[in-house]
Regions:
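Residue(s) in the substrate-gating loop at a strand-loop-helix junction
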Residues: 138
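Substrate-binding pocket helix/loop in short-chain dehydrogenase/reductase
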Residues: 94-95, 99-107, 205-206
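Active-site helix of classical SDR
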Residues: 118, 154, 162
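Catalytic Tyr-x(3-8)-Lys segment
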Residues: 97, 198-220
C-alpha cells in the first residue's frame, strides 16, 4: 500500500482501536505519534515498542493544548502527513438521569476533540498540499441505540463533520474520511461483552449480524485504516466506511 515514510499523529492511541492503528501503521513503516490525555505511561509503553514512535500528552478538549501538541509533534516527527482522530468516550446516557457534566464530557471529547485536532493541523496540511484525516465514527451514527443517545449524537456529528470537511479540504490535497466500527473488542466497551445484565442485548446483536461474529477486533479496524491512508484510496473523500460485521446491512 506504499505508506512507508509517512508520519501520523493518533489521538487516543494508547489503547483500543487507536493503539491497533498505531501498531499497524508502524509495521508499514509509518512514524507514529501516540497521543494520550490521562494514560501517558501506556502511550509511552506502546511507543517504546514501535520503531520511530513517540508519545505525547494532550487533552483534546483544550484547543490550546492541541495546538501545542501539533507543533511539538511536527518538530519531533518531521511533519504530519496523517491525522487519526481516535480519542473518544462511551457510556450510557439514559434520558431523565444523565446530568449536564456527563453530556458535556462526551460532547467535548468526541466532537470538540475531533474538531480541535483538525483545526490545529489543517494549516500545515494545506501548506504542504497533502494530508490524510481519518475520523472514528460508529455504526450508531446512522442507527439508534437505546440508552446511548448522546454517544449516537456525537458520532453522527463526526460523520457529517467528515463530509463537510472533505468538500472543503479536498482542493488542498487533503483526504478526509470516516471509519465507523460496529461492536469492536476494546477496553472502552468491555461491559457490553462481560456484563451479564447486557448479555440479552449482545445475543440479539449477534443474531442480527450476518457474519455471526459477536464483535470485530481492533486489528480489523486498523487494517482498514491502513488502506484508507494509502494512495490506493486516493478517490475517497467524505466516505463513511461501515465496518460492523454486516450488522446494519439489514436495517
Amino acid at each position: 500500500m506504499a505508506i512507508a515514510g509517512k508520519t501520523a499523529l493518533i489521538t487516543g492511541g494508547s489503547q483500543g482501536i487507536g493503539e491497533a492503528i498505531a501498531r499497524r501503521l508502524a509495521a508499514e513503516g509509518v512514524a507514529v505519534g501516540i497521543v494520550a490525555s490521562s494514560n501517558l505511561e501506556k502511550a509511552q509503553a506502546v511507543a517504546a515498542s514501535l520503531p520511530g514512535a513517540h508519545a505525547f500528552a494532550a487533552d483534546v478538549r483544550d484547543s490550546a493544548a492541541v495546538a501545542d501538541l501539533v507543533g511539538q509533534a511536527t518538530k519531533t516527527l518531521g511533519g504530519i502527513d496523517i491525522l487519526i482522530n481516535s480519542a473518544g468516550v462511551f457510556y450510557p446516557t439514559p434520558a431523565g438521569s444523565t446530568d449536564e457534566a456527563a453530556f458535556d464530557r462526551m460532547m467535548d471529547i468526541n466532537v470538540k476533540g475531533t474538531w480541535n485536532a483538525i483545526n490545529a493541523i489543517a494549516p500545515q496540511m494545506k501548506a504542504q498540499h497533502r494530508g490524510w484525516i481519518i475520523n472514528l465514527g460508529s455504526v450508531v451514527a446512522t442507527m439508534g441505540f437505546g440508552g446511548y443517545a448522546v454517544y449516537c449524537a456525537t458520532k453522527a456529528a463526526i460523520v457529517m463533520m467528515t463530509r463537510a470537511l472533505a468538500i472543503e479540504l479536498a482542493p488542498h490535497g487533503i483526504s478526509v474520511n470516516c471509519l465507523s466500527p460496529g461492536n469492536t473488542a476494546t477496553p472502552m466497551n468491555l461491559d457490553i461483552r462481560t456484563n451479564a445484565d447486557l448479555k440479552p442485548m449482545l445475543d440479539v446483536m449477534t443474531q442480527r449480524t450476518p457474519s455471526g461474529q459477536t464483535h470485530s477486533s481492533a486489528e480489523d479496524m486498523a487494517n482498514i485504516v491502513a488502506f484508507m491512508v494509502s494512495d490506493a484510496a486516493r478517490a475517497m473523500h467524505g466516505a463513511n466506511i461501515l465496518a460492523d460485521e454486516g450488522f446494519s446491512a439489514g436495517m
